Every structure is written in C-alpha cells, then in structure tokens.
C-alpha cells in the first residue's frame, strides 16, 4: 500500500525519486534484445516478471557495472546479493585477499572495477599490504560504504585534502580523477604536527556537501555522531568509523547487523530444499550405474542434456527477467 507521503509527491518527482524511468528504459532494451524469445510468452508477462525481479532485487545479477550502480536500489540489491551468495565464506571462517574478493564480485558482475575493490580493502587493511587476508565481515561492511556512497566519498576525499592543505573549506568541491580517494593513504603525522583534520570543521564541510548534492549520502545526524566522538581524525579513520557504525548500516538497509550476518533462514531453507531434491536423483543415478547397460543410459542422459543447451550463436537471454515461472 502506498504511504500518504508517496501519494503527496507530484508524479514527476515520484518518478525521479524512484528512478522509474531507468527501469522502464532497461526493460524496453531487454525486450528488444530478446524479442524472439519473449514473443512466445507475451510482452505483458515479460514486464510483470521484470518488475517483480526489480522488487525482489534479483534484476542486478550478472549485469554490467553501469547498470548495477545506476540507482540506490540497484546498489543495495547488489550488496544483498553478494552477502547472500558468499556468506558461507564468513560462516566457514575463511580469510581471503583483496584479489580473491574481487573474483567473487566478478562472478556477479563480470566487469566490476578492480579500483573499487582496492578502495574497500584499503579501509580494512590501512597500513598493511594489499595482499593481506581479510575476514568476510570486515570486507563486506567496508565494501558497503565504499560502493554505496562512492560519489560522496570522492567528494569527501577532496574536502579532506583541501583541509590538510589549508584551503577554504567552503569552496565547492568538484572531485576529479586526480583528487580522488586513491591519493590518500593513512600516514603518521610529522613530529609536532597533529594528525588528520579537526572533526568539527570537517563536519561543517560534510553537512554542506550533503545539502548541495543529490547522490546518496549517509544521514547527516549519524555523520555528526561519528565525528562528535573525536577531536581530530584522518580520512581513512573516518571511513572505518562509517563502516562500523550500526546506525548507518541500518539506515542503508541492505545488510543485517554484524551479529546476524551469517544467518539467512530463507536462503538456508532454499538450499536445504535443493539438497533434498538432489539426493534422490543422485541415488538413482548411482543405482543405475551398477546395472547392465548403464553406460548407454548415461550417454542418453548426456545427449538429452546437450540438446537443452542453446547454440553459441543464440542471444543470451536474461532468464530472471522473461523465463516463465512455473
């Protein structure tokens, strides 16, 4: 049911706020690319399943990075998908390197940029080498901040650098590739020089930044809470504080609390159901393998499986968007 606040918005403002046109344009593109396959199910059914997938957050699976980062909902959906797909890494206590986490990200988004993974790893590793091992939870919460608020953090990095160099903090900051976050590394202050910048002045600049820009920013009240606990801080100290802040994680709404990170009852139930379906099939195949002529049966099964594989020349459809749901 629509809330009164949504109904009070003008139609054009609601469309812009929810990025509806972005999804309509993407749906039409998918329709045109796969029109021959979709024609047998109907256009109405395709649009129904497409927007159902948007609501469920599965529409971002295996899509290009430009689409994954196109809207806040897409970013939150990607974070949730990454957590649900690979939480067993944390459940098993495995530690991975930055490169290994990047490979996991590329399983969901083949062209996911390495630079973004490196920035997330730097929040965790600080002064350590980039090939050091990280826990799943540490990387995930750092990645959440870096990925969801990437444009905000680029501007914050430029502001921090200007404050360090003594420039006017009220100057409008336009982040560029040369003023980006990758230039800033944790370092110890020189002898007699306080490290970092003054927290109160830093907050004033960030408050103005959130007012000026339309992209996603952490709630200003929570940013103020983070900065009110210290007198001075470094840029990466600020990012670490954001990644560990319980309220910011709740406000973003993509991931559970750290204590519940390894629990996903819905996914566990689905996996258990799939395992139960697979076991009888495996037992049947093992039993048949002991019977005379089992090789012929196995070969026939393989041929039947190969017949279901589409030819290499066929267009690759987005199955989650148009395949009929039984």
UniProtKB/Swiss-Prot annotation:
Annotated region described as Required for interaction with PCM1, given as residue ranges: 1-111
Name listed for the protein in its UniProt record: Centriolar satellite-associated tubulin polyglutamylase complex regulator 1
Subunit structure: Interacts with PCM1. Interacts with TTLL1, TPGS1, TPGS2 and LRRC49; the interactions link CSTPP1 to the complex TPGC. Binds to alpha-tubulin.
Higher taxonomy: Eukaryota, Metazoa, Chordata, Craniata, Vertebrata
Family stated for the protein in its record: Belongs to the CSTPP1 family.
Any one GO CC term of the record: microtubule
Region (Required for interaction with TPGS1, LRRC49, and TTLL1): 1-225
Signal peptide: none
CDD domains: DD_C11orf49 (cd22959)
Entry keywords, A to Z: Cytoplasm, Cytoskeleton, Microtubule, Phosphoprotein
Compartment(s) of residence: Cytoplasm, Cytoskeleton, Microtubule organizing center, Centrosome, Centriolar satellite; Cytoplasm, Cytoskeleton
PANTHER family hit by this protein: CENTRIOLAR SATELLITE-ASSOCIATED TUBULIN POLYGLUTAMYLASE COMPLEX REGULATOR 1, UPF0705 PROTEIN C11ORF49
Role: Regulator of the tubulin polyglutamylase complex (TPGC) that controls cytoskeletal organization, nuclear shape, and cilium disassembly by balancing microtubule and actin assembly. Regulates the assembly and stability of the TPGC and thereby modulates polyglutamylation of the microtubule, which antagonizes MAP4 binding.
Domain of life of the source: Eukaryota
